[in-house]
Amino acid sequence: MQQYLDLCKHILNNGIKKEDRTGTGTISTFGYQMRFDLQKGFPLLTTKKLHLKSIIHELLWFISGNTNIKYLKDNGVSIWDEWADENGNLGPVYGHQWRSWDTADGRSIDQLKGVIDQIKNNPDSRRLIVSSWNVGEIEKMALPPCHCFYQFYVVNGTLSCMLYQRSADVFIGVPFNIASYALFTMMIAQSCGLRAGEFVHTLGDAHIYLNHVEQVKLQLSRDPRPLPKMNINPDIKDLFQFKYSDFTLTDYDPHPHIKGAVAV
């Protein structure tokens, strides 16, 4: 995935050292965009092996509206462990905002169902938007949303998605985010009778943690390999009916995994 490697090069060549909330330190740039044509393969990084199981289960967890890590733990996914409280709760994070945004007048808005309805019935709308950034509930969240706002675009029978990510951990988080939102776009496209178009990834503070620099350089020394193919069960026409067994990845031939510590 040359787009990702170009991002890494851009940060190493143009980034500025900055302090951060975690105390780790970063090399950071502000404002960057990548585009992925989903008809040209599934954008799962090949310069290091990624744990696709975690990506799929986390996405299904978001879609369900769940904000407790029990489902993730039951399926061998530990990526949210550091932020959960003693009962496994994370507060009103992504899934809650997608499926039950609380309004000031006491109502609850299912943004995800709403945007799917609009894609089907008003595809030319410029309001095909879901936001995770609920200012009134940020302080209740274990971690404010990093990937916080996405918009869909329908043209010529295809569905594209653009994500705005305010904070982008380029070594660990961004490869997961690319694959997750690419798959999400494919799932919604199938649910709406459309083909998947592009995933457009817009980054705000795009950074490499200082303790990841050598790992990023190792990735840059590796040649990217052909992208794999994601096969989705064609019988599922409802986004909320997908399960883990409905996804099969083929032709994935990545370079070996590279370890890196998560900044908490």
From Swiss-Prot:
The GO cellular component terms are:
cytosol
According to UniProt, this protein's pathway is: Pyrimidine metabolism; dTTP biosynthesis
Query: What is this protein's name?
Result: Thymidylate synthase
Q: What is its main location?
A: cytoplasm
Q: What class of enzyme is it?
A: transferase
Checking InterPro entries in the record gives:
Thymidate_synth/dCMP_Mease, Thymidate_synth/dCMP_Mease_dom, Thymidate_synth/dCMP_Mease_sf, Thymidylate_synthase, Thymidylate_synthase_AS
Reaction it catalyzes: dUMP + (6R)-5,10-methylene-5,6,7,8-tetrahydrofolate = 7,8-dihydrofolate + dTMP
Catalytic residues, per the record, are 146
What keywords is this UniProt entry annotated with? Cytoplasm, Methyltransferase, Nucleotide biosynthesis, Transferase
Binding positions for dUMP per the UniProt entry: 21, 126-127, 166-169, 177, 207-209
GO biological process, any:
dTMP biosynthetic process
Quaternary structure note: Homodimer.
Described function: Catalyzes the reductive methylation of 2'-deoxyuridine-5'-monophosphate (dUMP) to 2'-deoxythymidine-5'-monophosphate (dTMP) while utilizing 5,10-methylenetetrahydrofolate (mTHF) as the methyl donor and reductant in the reaction, yielding dihydrofolate (DHF) as a by-product. This enzymatic reaction provides an intracellular de novo source of dTMP, an essential precursor for DNA biosynthesis.
What PANTHER family does the record tag this protein with? THYMIDYLATE SYNTHASE, THYMIDYLATE SYNTHASE 1
Q: Which family does it belong to?
A: Belongs to the thymidylate synthase family. Bacterial-type ThyA subfamily.
| Residue numbers binding (6R)-5,10-methylene-5,6,7,8-tetrahydrofolate | 51, 169, 263
The protein's Enzyme Commission number:
2.1.1.45
Q: Name one GO molecular function term.
A: thymidylate synthase activity
Per UniProt, subcellular location reads as: Cytoplasm
